[in-house]
Curated annotation (Swiss-Prot):
Cofactor note: Binds 1 [4Fe-4S] cluster per subunit. The cluster is presumably bound at the interface of two monomers.
InterPro entries xref list: Fe/S_biogenesis_protein_NfuA (IPR017726), FeS_biogenesis (IPR000361), FSCA_dom_sf (IPR034904), HesB-like_dom_sf (IPR035903), NIF_FeS_clus_asmbl_NifU_C (IPR001075)
NCBIfam families, per database record: PRK11190.1, YhgI_GntY
Protein name: Fe/S biogenesis protein NfuA
UniProt family annotation: Belongs to the NfuA family.
Length: 192
């Protein structure tokens, strides 16, 4: 479920040594499955352990995960990185905003998962996003751009060289292309 690097484990052991005996860490997701999902790590005293928590054993401590957060923390990683600017704990949870779909899910569900977990986070740096409108009978993913992508002068390059290439590589034989149905209006909201 959650991978914690050796450096992060050592960091947690050190932090927990200053806490009352029996204190664990809790890894959680606030608003899981939404665009506003946020992950966190906190102390978990013994009296805060719930009956439906999942307990994951590590060397020197245990991590608690509440039942609601658990499916959204699949494939999550925690690391402790040190560089010339200092040290930082990082938590990456690719499924926090949307639960990972199974390999036998419908094509639209699998594409929607890739959009939410991989493509939209990249577009968010420009204030943009895309939404899957439909998949046509001939395998065309019909997409609509929003936010900073609406009216951006680079939208065609983003669509063909970025999004289409990525989706066709991931869904060979199932998807034949992508189409933008956005009524682009360049304005202050547009990235370029």
């Amino acid at each position: 479920m959650i991978t914690i690097s050796e450096a992060a484990q050592a960091h947690f052991v050190k932090l927990l040594s200053d806490q009352p005996e029996g204190t664990h860490i809790r890894v959680f997701v606030i608003s899981p499955g939404t665009a506003q999902a946020e992950c966190g790590v906190s102390y978990c005293p013994p009296d805060a352990v719930e009956a439906d928590d999942t307990e994951i054993e590590f060397n020197g401590f245990n991590a608690m995960v509440d039942e609601k957060s658990a499916p959204f923390l699949e494939e999550a990683t925690i690391d402790f990185v040190t560089d010339q600017l200092g040290s930082q704990l990082t938590l990456k949870a690719p499924n926090a905003k949307m639960r990972k779909v199974s390999d036998d899910a419908s094509l639209s569900e699998r594409i929607e998962y890739v959009i939410q977990s991989e493509i939209n986070p990249q577009l968010a740096s420009h204030g943009g996003n895309i939404m899957l409108v439909e998949i046509t009978e001939d395998g065309i993913a019909v997409l609509q751009f929003g936010g900073g992508c609406n009216g951006c002068s680079m939208v065609d390059v983003t669509l063909k060289d970025g999004i289409e290439k990525q989706l066709l590589d991931m869904f060979p034989g199932e998807l034949s292309g992508v189409k933008d149905v956005t009524e682009h209006q360049h304005g202050e909201h547009s990235y370029q």
